[in-house]
Amino acid sequence: MISVRRGLNWLWYWGKRAVIGIVALWLAGILIFAFLPVPFSMVMIERQLGAWLTGDFSYVAHSDWVPMDEISPYMALAVMAAEDQKFPEHWGFDVGAIESALAHNQRNQNRIRGASTLSQQTAKNLFLWDGRSWVRKGLEVGLTAGIELVWTKRRILTVYLNIAEFGDGIFGVEAAARHFFNKPASKLSASEAALLAAVLPNPLRFKANAPSGYVISRQQWILRQMRQLGGKDFIQANDLD
């Protein structure tokens, strides 16, 4: 009985310190990456380790960091049009989108719709693992609040565009632009930006270099949304360029 109690005390002692250590690393990451380029994300680490564990040693999770000044404004506009049109005005969470998604998911349990903002996706991609769980979602909420508190909207968008997954081993808009269009991210056209944004829901299934009918349809929808938002003027009006 005493040995069991000692074992539980040992687990509690070290478990508590592990949690404190992880939280401290997250807080440090939020502060550091408010200014410095992000060298890698947790999703990149997860993909790389997954490849190695399956014996694929040729896989390389590749990303090339570029500042917002070297990213086409069409790309920033495209991801907002596709993923989070209220990004400039919300505080990390789109309550209306959450309520709409909950109502949709109750009616269509086989077709789950998400409501994650760009801020939430940035927090998840940077600090957390992939997949769906209430634990991960709870951690995501806290990290999103921290990011919104410390980072500017422009910084959130910059980090998002540099760590988003656009294909197998392709992370960040610079790597995606060079891989799919043989050009830097600064030269992306509206159509090319919309195509990259169209694969974001599932970049391992949807291909920018071999777009399905669904991807092309989504690309055209994103282009219409970009125009309705006001084009590049929307970026400038919200100090995101």
From Swiss-Prot:
One Pfam family, please name it: Transgly
| Its EC number(s) | 2.4.99.28
- This chain's protein is named Biosynthetic peptidoglycan transglycosylase
Origin organism of this chain?
Yersinia enterocolitica serotype O:8 / biotype 1B (strain NCTC 13174 / 8081)
The record's listing under HAMAP family reads: PGT_MtgA (MF_00766)
Chief subcellular location:
membrane
Query: What does the UniProt keyword field contain?
Result: Cell inner membrane, Cell membrane, Cell shape, Cell wall biogenesis/degradation, Glycosyltransferase, Membrane, Peptidoglycan synthesis, Transferase, Transmembrane, Transmembrane helix
EC primary class: transferase
Keyword rRNA processing on this protein? no
Q: What does this protein do?
A: Peptidoglycan polymerase that catalyzes glycan chain elongation from lipid-linked precursors.
What family classification does the UniProt entry report for this protein? Belongs to the glycosyltransferase 51 family.
Give the subcellular location.
Answer: Cell inner membrane
Highest taxon of source: Bacteria
> Among the entry's GO cellular component annotations, what is one?
peptidoglycan-based cell wall
Pathway annotation? Cell wall biogenesis; peptidoglycan biosynthesis
How does the entry describe its membrane topology?
Single-pass membrane protein
Question: What residue ranges are annotated as transmembrane?
Answer: 18-38
Q: Name one GO molecular function term.
A: pentosyltransferase activity
Q: Which InterPro entries match?
A: Glyco_trans_51 (IPR001264), Lysozyme-like_dom_sf (IPR023346), PBP_transglycosylase (IPR036950), Pep_trsgly (IPR011812)
- Catalysed reaction(s)? [GlcNAc-(1->4)-Mur2Ac(oyl-L-Ala-gamma-D-Glu-L-Lys-D-Ala-D-Ala)](n)-di-trans,octa-cis-undecaprenyl diphosphate + beta-D-GlcNAc-(1->4)-Mur2Ac(oyl-L-Ala-gamma-D-Glu-L-Lys-D-Ala-D-Ala)-di-trans,octa-cis-undecaprenyl diphosphate = [GlcNAc-(1->4)-Mur2Ac(oyl-L-Ala-gamma-D-Glu-L-Lys-D-Ala-D-Ala)](n+1)-di-trans,octa-cis-undecaprenyl diphosphate + di-trans,octa-cis-undecaprenyl diphosphate + H(+)
One GO biological-process annotation of the entry reads: regulation of cell shape
